[in-house]
Design a protein with these regions (language model features):
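Short, polar loop motifs at secondary-structure junctions
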Residues: 46-53, 84-88, 151-152
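Short, hydrophobic beta-strand segments that form beta-sheet elements in well-ordered domains
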Residues: 41-47, 79-82, 146-148
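Alpha-helical membrane-targeting segments
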Residues: 1-14, 67-68, 72-76, 121-142
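N-terminal pre-catalytic "stem/leader" segment of glycosyltransferase-like enzymes
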Residues: 1-69
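Extended catalytic core of nucleotide-activated donor transferases of GT-like folds
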Residues: 27-33, 56-122
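Conserved catalytic-core segment of nucleotide-activated headgroup transferases in glycan assembly
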Residues: 23-39, 159-160, 168, 174-223
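Active-site-proximal region of nucleotide-activated glycan assembly enzymes
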Residues: 94-182
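Nucleotide donor/acceptor-binding cores
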Residues: 13-14, 97, 202-205
Length: 223
């Protein structure tokens, strides 16, 4: 039904919709500011009341992604920006849009088509894993643009998403750029202390565990 609707509903020339599985943030938030600065109409599609509250606090237009309005906005948007998957916006109305996948990390480990968990079949049926891999690859082909932080990352993303060289462009990536062009050490420490209190001269350690191939994320260390 969604596919039929997107064939009939004309897409706007200047409407962009944004969404992220983790709320108002990620690379989509950085691109939001660029789009708005260039005069594009932008709407953030929310998945929870917390997201809606965050959008309201930021003073930006928003709509629930699972609502009729969320469907309509996604179906009308010329550009759809996501960070995880089509479910970041209204998944039933993305067909035909210029889909920008910003992703949400650096592929230090295997992901997508390169990770066994992607096509892990819930039942031991012959050919099911292959069918799941095919379905995943077909879904990813809707992506029109996927920015990469470097040429090394570009190659890994091409393999993981099954996309050609023309779809993945080395432009830099907001989540990564901040590490090289972000605040100084003293500024970063000040931000930490504003959250946790004074750390005096203590050494600070960043604990950033990677994705566990579909398993539960590791807990915060206690020692």
């Amino acid at each position: 039904l969604g596919l039929v609707a997107t064939r009939l509903i004309p897409r706007s020339k200047d409407l962009w919709v944004f969404g992220s599985a983790v709320g108002v943030g990620e690379g989509a938030w950085a691109l939001w500011h660029v789009a708005v600065a260039h005069g594009e109409r932008a709407v953030w599609l929310t998945g929870s009341q917390r997201d809606a509250d965050a959008a309201r606090s930021a003073g930006i237009r928003s709509a629930p992604k699972r609502s009729l309005r969320g469907f309509w906005l996604t179906a009308r948007a010329r550009v759809v920006v996501i960070t995880h998957g089509a479910g970041d916006v209204n998944r039933y109305a993305t067909s035909g849009a210029f889909l920008v996948q910003l992703w949400h990390g650096i592929p230090l480990k295997r992901l997508g088509l390169d990770s066994p968990v992607t096509a892990r079949a819930p039942l031991p049926l012959p050919g099911l894993a292959r069918l799941l891999a095919y379905a995943y690859a077909r879904t990813q082909r809707r992506i029109r643009l996927l920015p990469a932080a470097s040429h090394l990352v570009r190659g890994r993303l091409e393999s993981a998403f099954g996309l050609g060289h023309d779809r993945i462009v080395v432009t830099g990536e907001p989540r990564v750029d901040v590490l090289s062009a972000g605040p100084t050490e003293s500024e970063a420490r000040a931000v930490v202390e504003s959250l946790v209190g004074s750390v005096a001269g203590a050494r600070l350690v960043l604990y950033a565990p990677t994705w566990r191939d579909g398993d539960r994320d590791p807990a915060v260390p206690t020692a």
